């Protein structure tokens, strides 16, 4: 096998070495400055007013502030969930419940790269583990 160019044929290499961002670039991660609790179909601040910071282990930079739920918040969330289950969810036919669960799984798959990047930023784990194991397994739990 010859490694020399064929006589009379010029090899022209493109000198534009610009690339798109890597699929695992942190640019895909849209992280808000603060996250509240999701209770009864809406986002609400914690009753205590307390938040904790989540930090990136790799850079030690703050990613976001997360609402810190206390007993009253947990009680409100459980009460809302119980009410939703007893009055709505349990009355839906199984096929309809399955459609909702399937849609959640599909949304998780559609946003898998974003979730994997955020999980790796937050937990410090290798992107390959988040991307190839954690997020696909989380979505798989919702498939009906």
Language model segments and positions:
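Glycine-rich loop-to-alpha-helix module at the N-terminal edge of alpha/beta enzyme cores
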Residues: 59-144
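Terminal low-complexity tails and localization/encapsulation signals of metabolic enzymes
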Residues: 1-65, 99, 103
């Amino acid at each position: 096998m010859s490694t020399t160019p064929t006589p009379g044929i010029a090899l022209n290499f493109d000198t534009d070495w610009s690339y798109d961002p890597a699929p695992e670039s942190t640019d895909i991660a849209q992280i808000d400055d603060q996250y509240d609790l999701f209770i009864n179909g809406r986002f609400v601040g914690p009753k205590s007013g307390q938040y904790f910071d989540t930090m990136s282990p790799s850079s030690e930079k703050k990613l976001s502030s997360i609402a810190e739920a206390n007993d009253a918040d947990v009680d409100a969330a459980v009460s809302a969930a119980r009410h939703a289950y007893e009055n709505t969810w349990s009355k839906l036919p199984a096929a309809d419940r399955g459609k909702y669960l399937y849609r959640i799984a599909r949304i998780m798959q559609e946003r898998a790269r974003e979730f994997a990047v955020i999980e790796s930023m937050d937990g410090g784990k290798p992107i390959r583990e988040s991307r190839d194991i954690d997020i696909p397994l989380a979505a798989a739990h919702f498939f009906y």
